[in-house]
Swiss-Prot record:
Family (UniProt): Belongs to the cytochrome b family.
Protein name: Cytochrome b
Name of the gene: MT-CYB
Organism of derivation: Uria aalge
Record keyword Chaperone present: no
Binding site for heme b b562: 84, 183
GO biological process terms held by the UniProt record: mitochondrial electron transport, ubiquinol to cytochrome c
Topology in the lipid bilayer: Multi-pass membrane protein
CDD domains, per the entry: cytochrome_b_C, Cytochrome_b_N
Cellular component GO terms, alphabetical: mitochondrial inner membrane; respiratory chain complex III
Keywords of this entry: Electron transport, Heme, Iron, Membrane, Metal-binding, Mitochondrion, Mitochondrion inner membrane, Respiratory chain, Transmembrane, Transmembrane helix, Transport, Ubiquinone
Matching InterPro entries: Cyt_b/b6_C, Cyt_b/b6_C_sf, Cyt_b/b6_N, Cytb/b6-like_sf, Cytochrome_b, Cytochrome_b_C_euk/bac, Cytochrome_b_N_euk/bac, Di-haem_cyt_TM
Protein location: Mitochondrion inner membrane
Cofactor(s) for this UniProt protein: heme b
Length: 380
């Protein structure tokens, strides 16, 4: 019998074992679609970003007008830019849902996969932040100033670190050029990390909605899940193109249509919607270093979730108390997101502080306590 190239060729073998003959749990739901959606988001962002970079000039005097030129004079430049800007929002929607799925179904017990995933989230956040600075509008400039300034809270080396990051004594041309370099580099780093993420995942195989081993019932990835993924792509591209074509600036800040001016501070400096929850946590502590630590902890706390799993069951499918806690956490994150977009005044200050406290309490205290309590109730 002639050798099957798909199974014998060194490169095709890799593709085959990851996308074609991969044994997959038969009962994984649509919540398992977000991994592939993140992959397609990354590809879309790299492609549109590359096309934008060909027309972009990383210079403070030209950056803003080069972006305007792309939108006005380049063939479909407006569409490429709108897809890139809104693609970032969809990237974050997908990653947050992906993390939520992992949290709900106990996928974090694949520790290496989970930890590389958290590193991927951090890399994505860094990429989105430096990318937001590039159009060099008012919010770009002041966002860069405020967020980079947070590093000055680090004792002893803080100020030196900030000036080193800026390439001077304020956010200026050197900052913009290095941010462009970083924004170009990081997505490829994300792609490499995603490969590692998948390698770790395929060591143990995918989890499933019941949180039980599925070795007895696996089906090949292709055609079943390849088709399901393509359906997912279509369902995601529909709202993305709708947003990019009909209301491309819905999620942006009007302040960014004004070129950066170091002499005029915008009335409300706030990041894009996907960072608002972390921004609210940062603002809820009236001390600079404390706020920075809370901001870092808001994401880094995800590294602790595998250690805080006290339940004898993996998923929350059959744990109503944990489910209640999970949805409380989701509602709490939405409250934080809303508070982050509001000015720093009463009642938003106290709401933000309570929501921040609740966020950490649920993750660090209540989840392990409720997990242990459920074990007791089930006589485990």
């Amino acid at each position: 019998m002639a050798p099957n190239l798909r199974k014998s060729h060194p490169l095709l073998k890799l593709v085959n074992n990851s996308l074609i003959d991969l044994p997959t749990p038969s009962n994984i739901s649509a919540w398992w679609n977000f991994g592939s959606l993140l992959g397609i988001c990354l590809l879309t962002q790299i492609l549109t970003g590359l096309l934008l970079a060909t027309h972009y000039t990383a210079d403070t005097t030209l950056a803003f007008s080069s972006v305007a030129h792309t939108c006005r004079n380049v063939q479909y430049g407006w569409l490429i830019r709108n897809l890139h800007a809104n693609g970032a929002s969809f990237f974050f929607i997908c990653i947050y849902l992906h993390i939520g799925r992992g949290f709900y179904y106990g996928s974090y017990l694949n520790k290496e996969t989970w930890n590389t995933g958290v590193i991927l989230l951090l890399a994505l956040m860094a990429t989105a932040f430096v990318g937001y600075v590039l159009p060099w509008g008012q919010m770009s400039f002041w966002g860069a100033t405020v967020i980079t300034n947070l590093f000055s809270a680090i004792p002893y080396i803080g100020q030196t670190l900030v000036e080193w990051a800026w390439g001077g004594f304020s956010v200026d041309n050197p900052t913009l050029t290095r941010f462009f370099a970083l924004h170009f580099l990081l997505p490829f780093m994300i792609a490499g990390l995603a490969f590692i993420h998948l390698t770790f995942l395929h060591e143990s195989g995918s989890n499933n909605p019941l949180g039980i081993p599925s070795n007895c019932d696996k089906i090949p990835f292709h055609p079943y899940f390849s088709l399901k993924d393509i359906l997912g792509f279509i369902i995601m591209f529909l709202p993305l193109t709708t947003l990019a074509l009909f209301s491309p600036n819905l999620l942006g800040d009007p302040e960014n249509f004004t070129p950066a001016n170091p002499l005029v501070t915008p009335p409300h400096i706030k990041p894009e919607w996907y960072f608002l929850f972390a921004y609210a946590i940062l603002r809820s502590i009236p001390n600079k270093l404390g706020g920075v630590l809370a901001l870092a902890a808001s994401v880094l706390v995800l590294f602790l979730t595998p250690l805080l799993h006290k339940s004898k069951q993996r998923a929350m499918t059959f744990r109503p108390l944990s489910q209640l806690l999970f949805w409380t956490l989701v509602a709490n994150l939405l409250i934080l997101t809303w508070v982050g977009s509001q000015p720093v005044e009463h009642p938003f200050i106290i709401i933000g502080q309570l929501a921040s406290l609740t966020y950490f309490t649920i993750l660090l205290l209540l989840f392990p306590i409720i997990g242990a309590l459920e074990n007791k109730m089930l006589n485990y």
